[in-house]
Each structure stands twice: as structure tokens, then as C-alpha cells.
Amino acid sequence: MKAKIAIICSMLLGVFSLPVHAAEVGVTNTEIRIGQFAALTGPAAELGKRLQQGILAHFAAVNAASGINGRSLKLISRDDGYEPNKAIVAVKTLIDEDKVFALIGSVGTPTTLAAVPAINAAGIPLIGPFTGAQALREPFNRNLFHVRASYLDETERIVQHLSTLGISKIAVFHQNDSYGKAGLEGVVRALAKRNLNPAATVTVERNSVDVAGPLA
């Protein structure tokens, strides 16, 4: 997680290595406003909070070193509770009311997918979304800057490793939304390359803490 946060922030700083003028939305003579929409409450809150804390720590270090061209970085975080409808509201608030210059560190496939139309309409960059879904990589989106591997790559490596251990009966326990289905797709593709099928598939609802029930 620390490495991912460092990469995300480094990409953001790369954006600011270019000349930034006060006339830009989210940029004043003294600060640059950056927005984050993520789960800060609910079962997935630890992911959102850790990203938020890491970004804040990195921003503090940059600001202590005179910021970006004399401007301090300010993070504005909006809670989406890991729910798509709330993510849409959060990102629109960041864009329309908070007037941020860029977005950073969203958490989750369903929430990021839901926010993409508003991101594209505003032409605002989203740096380091915490998701590996192929739907956010293909077709190419000039507003999205990824720093992590795709779920297809990750699941291929998982199945590859299990195969080296002689394990061929592989079941998939996945979240019943775009995030879980992206992971399922990756496993199915990886198994198909080895002439295998999932031994079983079981789903759990997003934000549910009852994982024992579906497995019973």
C-alpha cells in the first residue's frame, strides 16, 4: 500500500512539474486543491482511510519543502461509502463545488466506473484509482492514470502459481458487482488457457459482512 501511495503521489507531482497557472480551476496563488472520493465509512473504509492518510502524509512532506512552485497541496476527501450512487454525488461535488484541479486515489471498481461519466465531462484527471478492472482500461481513457496491475494480470499469476502446486480444482468466491465480476472474468480466462473451468462460483453482496452465509 505504501508503495502504491508513493507512486500515485509521484504521478500527481509529475502533472505539476508542468507550468500551472492560477487561472486553472483548483489553483490559486497559494494552493492546489486535489479531490478524493473513497470509502471513508462502512466495511470498506479501511482502504479509503489508508489511502487518504498516505496521500496526506505525502502532501505534508511536499508542502514542508515549499510545495509546488510555492503552492501548497490541499486534499479534499468525499466519502462514497463504497456505493456507486454516492460516488457520483461525491465526484460531482468535488468538481462543481470544491473546484478541484485533479482527482486522486478513488477506491473500488463500481464506484470508479460510476464516476467516469462526470470525470470525462469535466475533462479532469483521476490519478491512481484503486481498481484493476479492465473496463477502466479498455477502451483507453485519457483522463484515467493507472498505477496498479489489472485484475486480468493478477488472476493469471494466481492461477499460474496454483497450477505449479498441482492444484486444478479452483473455486471463485467473489463480490456480486463489477469488481467481483472483473475478478471472476480473470480467473475464468486464466483457467480456460489451461483447459479448466471454475470448480464452483459463490457470490457475496457488496458491503456485506456476512461471508459465512454464502459459503455454507
Spell out what each predicted region is:
Residues 1-33:
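Short, low-complexity disordered leader/linker segments with a strong preference
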Residues 22-36, 67-72, 163-168:
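Immediate post-signal peptide segment of exported/extracytoplasmic ligand-binding proteins
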Residues 38-44:
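Short glycine-rich His-centered loop
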Residues 89, 134-135, 142-216:
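Extracellular/periplasmic Venus flytrap/periplasmic-binding protein
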Residues 31-33, 46-53, 61, 65-135, ...:
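Beta-alpha junction/loop-to-helix N-cap segments that form part of ligand/metal-binding clefts
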Residues 39, 80, 175:
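Cofactor-binding loop segments of dinucleotide-utilizing enzymes, especially the Rossmann-like FAD-
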